[in-house]
């Protein structure tokens, strides 16, 4: 690298530092003083279910007063308690109301009633990366790199706030109208200084240290990034099998095979991200995220332009207007039932 290029890189890294320091101030204000009860169920018209989970659903809703569309996550308090997800749910809301980044879905309102917790988020009509990836088969390397760069920046932001995301997968990445990513579902995200021990995540994306019940840190997110880049570029994940136990055996073995069409730069980056040895895994070394940002596979990436959303997206989802749901699957609809008595008031008092 020439002197001029090195100087440019140095000043970019300095301005990133300044940006993150300011971002942390903003985050901490909201983290310490979380917004509560900023809307009410009656203010929204419920339109259609966009997804379902073990303790709730996500619905497209329309704000009656403004006509704006949102995605409303509805969680059944009693089910959350039964599934021992109280802590995770409180984490999700507390984190979402405090963060602010171009590739993180925005929490617009949150509230609760006798039966449910509600998180009202920006509606991202392009649907999940998962469905586009399965339809197209696999993404070209430039296409995969465009998305990967946004995740790198997002993790750099989250990690600087001591947040581990822990649930990276194509199902949790929505594609917006401009073709950029919106990361959703902070159900497993956690603020951790140092190490944590909870087993959570999706089998194919779990880092070896989580499987081996070791204390782990934010390096698990960089491992998951390696899995995601592999899956985007190959069309299937690097470790798969019928049973989770077989997947886990493959993950901890430290052996990865690459499709012949992967470029040598891509294989090199993935070997450094899918690195079982934490003392060698990119993102976890003394240069931190810069080992990833300065890797040859990202040589053509203009990080600032990606952050500013100035790079032309490789793919724009088709959609026919603000309330269009054609990029989401259909689900059976269900009434939202609200009890006349308060359920689990104590457990969710801080929500």
Curated annotation (Swiss-Prot):
Please provide the record's keywords in A-Z order.
ATP-binding, cAMP, Cell membrane, Cytoplasm, Kinase, Lipoprotein, Membrane, Mitochondrion, Myristate, Nucleotide-binding, Nucleus, Phosphoprotein, Serine/threonine-protein kinase, Transferase
What's the EC number here?
2.7.11.11
Q: Do you know which PROSITE patterns this protein is assigned to?
A: AGC_KINASE_CTER (PS51285), PROTEIN_KINASE_ATP (PS00107), PROTEIN_KINASE_DOM (PS50011), PROTEIN_KINASE_ST (PS00108)
Coiled-coil regions listed in the entry? none
| Activity regulation, per record | Allosterically activated by various compounds, including ATP. Activated by cAMP; the nucleotide acts as a dynamic and allosteric activator by coupling the two lobes of apo PKA, enhancing the enzyme dynamics synchronously and priming it for catalysis.
Q: Could you list the residues that carry lipid attachment of the N-myristoyl glycine kind.
A: 2
A Gene Ontology molecular function term for this protein is: protein kinase A regulatory subunit binding
| Residues found modified as Phosphoserine | 11, 140, 339
PTM annotation (Phosphothreonine): residues = 49, 196, 198
The protein's location, in the record's own words, is: Cytoplasm; Cell membrane; Membrane; Nucleus
User: What positions does the entry give for ATP binding?
Assistant: 50-58, 73, 122-128, 169-172
Give the Deamidated asparagine positions (modified residues): 3
Location of the active site: 167 (proton acceptor)
Q: Name one GO cellular component term.
A: cytoplasm
Sites where Phosphotyrosine occurs are at 331
Membrane topology, from the record: Lipid-anchor
Domain Protein kinase, residue spans: 44-298
The UniProt entry lists the main location of this chain as cytoplasm
Q: Which reaction does it catalyse?
A: L-seryl-[protein] + ATP = O-phospho-L-seryl-[protein] + ADP + H(+); L-threonyl-[protein] + ATP = O-phospho-L-threonyl-[protein] + ADP + H(+)
What tissues has this protein been observed in?
Answer: Ubiquitously expressed in mammalian tissues.
What does this gene product do?
Phosphorylates a large number of substrates in the cytoplasm and the nucleus. Phosphorylates CDC25B, ABL1, NFKB1, CLDN3, PSMC5/RPT6, PJA2, RYR2, RORA, SOX9 and VASP. Regulates the abundance of compartmentalized pools of its regulatory subunits through phosphorylation of PJA2 which binds and ubiquitinates these subunits, leading to their subsequent proteolysis. RORA is activated by phosphorylation. Required for glucose-mediated adipogenic differentiation increase and osteogenic differentiation inhibition from osteoblasts. Involved in chondrogenesis by mediating phosphorylation of SOX9.
Q: How does it assemble?
A: A number of inactive tetrameric holoenzymes are produced by the combination of homo- or heterodimers of the different regulatory subunits associated with two catalytic subunits. cAMP causes the dissociation of the inactive holoenzyme into a dimer of regulatory subunits bound to four cAMP and two free monomeric catalytic subunits. The cAMP-dependent protein kinase catalytic subunit binds PJA2. Activates cAMP-sensitive PKAI and PKAII holoenzymes by interacting with regulatory subunit (R) of PKA, PRKAR1A/PKR1 and PRKAR2A/PKR2, respectively.
> What protein does this entry describe?
cAMP-dependent protein kinase catalytic subunit alpha
User: Source species, please?
Assistant: Sus scrofa (Pig)
UniProt lists the gene as: PRKACA
